[in-house]
Regions:
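Glycan-recognition and catalytic cores of secretory/periplasmic carbohydrate-active enzymes
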Residues: 1-303
Length: 303
């Protein structure tokens, strides 16, 4: 859940291997009244209008990674403990699925996702959490679970995975792997999944490299589809375009800035700069807001 206080900043890691910050600074969520609503184990739940409070793997991961970055900066025992409570949740809630593991959303979601459903974003962020736990502890159980979490990236949606395709056949990992409707190709979810693959490559000596290369190549080719000439699109859907909210537009910029640094692909950096320039024009911000309102009137957002 995003708020008007969101400030996404990219954190570029140093050349040193090993313990590293998460690439998007989520520390603001710990200090600006963000609703974490922790359970008795110190794990956050998320409020949904339609289904009440639920465990959301991405919410748990965000809390873990926010605490991780603060821990690295301050060496706070409390933030370290908060991080490992979420690590425990990911280990305890990793569900076997064939050769892999998944983290499930245990409630129905609009558009045809039925309990339990999975998401590339949850898988990617879970991998990022466990890779950092492994780097700090060298506990092989964390790394093994992270390895197995990649399996659904290789499976098509019709096979129970999260792998979709752009019209040109390129890979797109799906945040919302709808089984009975065209894929939505949500950009930020795909990018979070790529961060997970990048982390696994770093922690596991190149494991997942083939999948990572296919995803980076596909996004490099298809990224221009998310450009609206005045703003970025949240997803690729037929009909009325869906401009990103200002928060998600800023997140796209931060994610692409990091991806440019980690892959060396110039198109990601160039696109981030172009989208940053869009944001500076009041007319673009107004057009994006109007476009988002129009899209939501015609396509109410699930909550």
């Amino acid at each position: 859940m995003l708020s008007q206080q969101t400030v996404y900043l990219p954190l570029i890691p140093t050349a040193e291997r090993g313990v590293r910050p998460y690439y998007i600074d989520l520390g603001f969520t710990l200090t600006k009244g963000f609703d974490w609503s922790l359970d008795e184990s110190g794990v956050p739940t998320r409020p949904y209008y339609s289904v009440g409070r639920q465990y959301s793997p991405t919410r748990v991961a965000a809390f873990a990674l926010a605490n991780w970055n603060v821990f690295l900066e301050t060496h706070s025992a409390q933030h370290k403990a908060n991080f490992f409570r979420q690590v425990d949740w990911f280990m305890q809630n990793a569900r076997d699925r064939g050769a892999g593991v998944v983290w499930e959303y245990c409630f129905d979601w609009a558009g045809g996702l039925r309990d339990p459903w999975i998401s590339c974003m949850a898988q990617g962020e879970g991998i990022s959490v466990l890779c950092r736990a492994y780097e700090l502890t060298r506990n092989d159980e964390y790394l093994d679970t992270a390895r197995r979490a990649v399996h659904v990236f290789q499976q098509g949606i019709e096979e129970g995975g999260v792998r979709g395709e752009y019209p040109d056949g390129g890979v797109c990992l799906e945040e919302y792997p709808y089984p009975d409707r065209p894929p939505s190709h949500v950009l930020n979810g795909f990018l979070y999944a790529l961060f997970g693959l990048l982390d696994l490559r770093e922690s596991d000596g190149g494991n997942g490299e083939e999948m990572l290369d296919a995803c980076v190549s596909s996004l490099r080719t298809n990224l221009e589809q998310y450009g609206l000439k005045y703003w970025s699109a949240y997803e690729l859907v037929q009909g009325v375009p869906n401009p990103a909210t200002r928060d998600y537009h800023d997140l796209h910029i931060a994610q692409l800035t990091v991806l440019h640094h980690l892959t060396g692909e110039s198109v990601f950096g160039e696109t981030a700069e172009a989208w940053r320039a869009y944001r500076m024009k009041p007319s673009n911000r107004a057009k994006a807001l109007f476009g988002k309102l129009k899209h939501r009137i015609l396509n109410p957002a699930p909550r």
